[in-house]
Design a protein with these regions (language model features):
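Conserved polar/disulfide-associated segments of primarily extracytoplasmic proteins
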Residues: 66-166
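N-terminal targeting sequences that direct proteins away from the cytosol to non-cytosolic compartments
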Residues: 2-76, 82-83, 143, 163-187
Length: 187
């Protein structure tokens, strides 16, 4: 082989190795950026009827809109809002009639589906040990366009959806407190 051919191959190998190193570094940085520190203190809200508990800041209050949701034609098992100084977190729980689970779908498949539906900033996150699809959508509200972030998960029984206009730096530490439980049986 000619000296220039060997140098060319060596340059390709070095470029490949450098590219792999950069990719590994970016992956490690992204994984570190995904670490979310849960809020400390706060008050725990018991949603065991829907299979979870959630801790919110001490100044938060809770409104139950389930009756209003049903009166407006909604089918939520629970519809409510936890709210405080930093904003509002709407919480919806639905029966999962399809019986599927988010974890049975590949990440790329889910992200592509939501992006094709018009969502932006779509990504998967793990909160409370369960996968969530997280996305942003812009909707036309009474006062013009509004941007909402949704954090959604489902298993074979229940679909849980958190919707908010709060900054992700404020809402993610709250959502990081979610603990999944068995669904409490009601008589």
């Amino acid at each position: 082989m000619k000296k220039s051919t060997v140098q060319y191959i060596l340059a390709l190998v070095i470029c490949f190795a450098v590219g792999c190193g950069i990719a590994l570094g970016l992956n490690a940085y992204d994984k570190n950026a995904e670490l979310i520190t849960p809020i400390s203190g706060g008050q725990t809200i018991d949603f065991s009827a829907y299979g979870f508990t959630l801790t919110v800041p001490d100044d938060f209050a809770m409104n139950d809109y389930t009756t209003n949701n049903a009166a407006e034609g909604g089918n939520a098992l629970f519809a409510g809002c936890a709210y405080g100084e930093i904003g509002e977190l709407y919480i919806f729980c639905y029966t999962n009639d399809s019986g599927d689970e988010l974890r049975q779908y590949g990440e790329q498949e889910v992200v592509t589906y939501y992006m094709n539906a018009g969502a932006t900033d779509v990504r998967m996150r793990t909160l409370g040990g369960r996968r969530f699809i997280c996305y942003r959508a812009t909707v036309n509200g009474q006062d013009g366009e509004e941007t909402w972030d949704t954090y959604e998960t489902w298993n074979e029984d229940i679909q849980i959806s958190f919707e908010t206009r709060m900054n992700p730096d404020d809402v993610l530490p709250i959502l990081a407190t979610i603990t999944f439980t068995s669904i409490a049986q009601t008589n």
